[in-house]
A protein has these predicted regions:
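Glycine-rich cofactor phosphate-binding loops and adjacent beta1-alpha1 units
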Residues: 162-166, 206-285, 346
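C-terminal hydrophobic helical "lid"/dimerization subdomain
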Residues: 1-3, 250-254, 293-347
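Short Gly/Pro-enriched turn/cap motifs at secondary-structure boundaries
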Residues: 7, 19-20, 53-59, 111-117, ...
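Residue-level recognition of short, solvent-exposed, well-ordered loop/turn junctions
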Residues: 23-24, 77, 166, 257, ...
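NAD(P)H dinucleotide-binding glycine-rich loop of Rossmann-like/cofactor-binding domains
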Residues: 92-174, 311
């Protein structure tokens, strides 16, 4: 089969690799129908994730069709169309029993495209299938569903749920990339008074408005002052960081009200300063997290009922064999306007 293979930092190739096979009775083999690219994949290609070694097939998000299932698999069978989650779960360890699948200690967690071969290929082996793939109704489009493999559960669980968004809240989302936009969309489910989006790209602020943000502001145009003006100087109830750089995290801590919450969604590669001398007396709560995907079944139901606008985040489409071109477009989002790119297998 063909797959995108990490060769060394800065270099990948779309080339022939052996087809995957069943290695454990809990496995399924999925023929990939649609796949997307994540910002984490770009970090891997740059060499920022040392656990990913040369020869690894990349990718951790897909929709496809089960072609083979191990003897212990109970929830799907060959021919079923499924969502492949970014998180795999053994279902037996302490963390899985608490539905904290991202922390699985039984061989799961974030493994696809990380410690085992991933989804940016014609076929993928998915371990622990009963908790790692989800049957899809025929009414759900593959390009819409694939965004529920990672960014929507991440935005909802790590941003909205950790942030405790409630009716009447003022919510600020710093970073209007795919994760931030998904956080805006899922925040709207809780009827906040307003959602404020902060970004440097005007096109992304336009997208934020289309997804329900009542106010937008460029990051270089005093967003802290806008938040203060809209909240009588108090600050926001919930501030979400969806960029992953120290400066934006520190900005978030300056925009939250006393007793408010800062929910960090962004993936950070450098230390950020934590001004506890200012925050402790304000009773500010700060949360972090890796997605567990425990919300995926609920989000899939909402998608099937037309309540989740995932299609609005897809800006570019490619065929699976155009993987390297898709990476180029996605990596130059400031020039190309890319939010999410979706690649389809030839029909």
């Amino acid at each position: 089969m063909k797959a995108l293979v990490f060769q060394e930092p800065g270099r990948t190739t779309w080339r022939d690799v052996p087809d995957p096979g069943i290695e454990d009775a809990s496995d399924v083999i999925v023929r990939v129908d649609a796949v997307t690219i994540c910002g984490t994949d770009l970090h891997i290609v740059k060499g920022d994730v040392p656990e990913v070694t040369p020869g690894r097939v990349l990718g951790h998000e897909a929709v496809g069709t089960v072609v083979e299932a191990g003897g212990d698999v109970r929830t799907v069978r060959p021919g079923d169309r499924v969502l492949v989650s970014c998180i795999s779960a053994c279902g037996r360890c302490r963390f899985c029993r608490e539905a904290r699948y991202g922390q699985c200690r039984g061989g799961g967690g974030w493994v696809l495209g990380h410690t085992i071969d991933g989804t940016q290929a014609e076929y993928v082996r998915v371990p622990f299938a009963d908790l790692s793939v989800y049957p899809l109704p025929n009414s759900v489009d593959s390009a819409d569903a694939v965004l529920l493999a990672d960014i929507f559960p991440t935005a909802y669980e790590v941003g909205v749920r950790n942030g405790g968004v409630s009716p009447g809240d003022t919510v600020v989302v710093v970073g209007a990339g795919p994760i931030g936009l998904a956080a805006i969309a899922t925040s709207r489910l809780y009827s906040p008074e307003r959602v404020i989006a902060v970004d440097l790209a005007d096109a992304r602020l336009d997208a934020a408005r289309s997804l329900g943000a009542e106010a937008t502001v460029r990051a270089d145009e005093e967003p802290q002052q806008l938040v203060a003006d809209l909240t009588d100087g108090l600050g926001a109830d919930v501030v979400m960081e969806a960029v992953g750089v120290p400066e934006t995290f520190e900005t978030c801590t300056r925009m939250v009200r006393p007793g408010g919450r800062v929910a960090n969604i962004g993936v950070h590669g450098k230390p950020a300063t934590l001004h506890l001398e200012d925050l402790w007396i304000k009773d500010v709560t700060i949360t972090t997290g890796l997605v567990d995907t425990s919300s995926t079944p609920m989000l899939l139901r909402m998608l099937a009922n037309g309540r989740l606008p995932s299609a609005e985040l897809v800006t570019h489409r490619f065929e699976l064999g155009e993987m390297e071109e898709a990476y180029d477009v996605f990596s130059r989002a400031a020039d190309t306007g890319a939010l999410k790119v979706v690649l389809h297998a030839p029909r």
